[in-house]
Amino acid sequence: MLVALRGAQKEMWTALPGSIVSYDASKQTAAVQTTVKARIADPKGGVDWVDVPVLVDCPILFPSGGGFTLTFPIVAGDECLVVFSSRCIDGWWQSSGVQIPPDLRIHSLSDGFVFVGPRSQPKRITPSPSATAVEIRSDDHAVYIRITADHDIEALTPGDASVTASGTITL
């Protein structure tokens, strides 16, 4: 039974790290090359390691809720994590709301959601992220907005800063 279970698990995709190949901002989808090879048996009983085909039309997940969304640029080469839905997402993706899956596939490479941001060690954020504040920052930390636990707000930019408001601005 354990052998049968392991055989079934080989066909079950859950999550894989990847690299953005291209991004379509209007559709909010990406093409992703996974960065872990797939193991397949060769005809002689050996094992080959092959690239998983590029995953296309994968929805990008931007953190959002309550009418607000955090967005950021996405470019080729950005590292990501692709999480595969346990059921076909096509009906939901096209129409929103509760849908009957148009296909009975499960854990398919066709049903991946992309979280941009997980990083391998060579591409980790340096300098390291703050351990005491929330930051919106550039990777090189040359520009940032920081909110601290002491309720302070700090902003830094080597360039110009502008604020446009239809009401009062207090600094």
Predicted regions and their residues:
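Hydrophobic packing positions characteristic
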Residues: 1-159
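Short, intrinsically disordered, charge-balanced linker/junction segments flanking boundaries
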Residues: 164-171
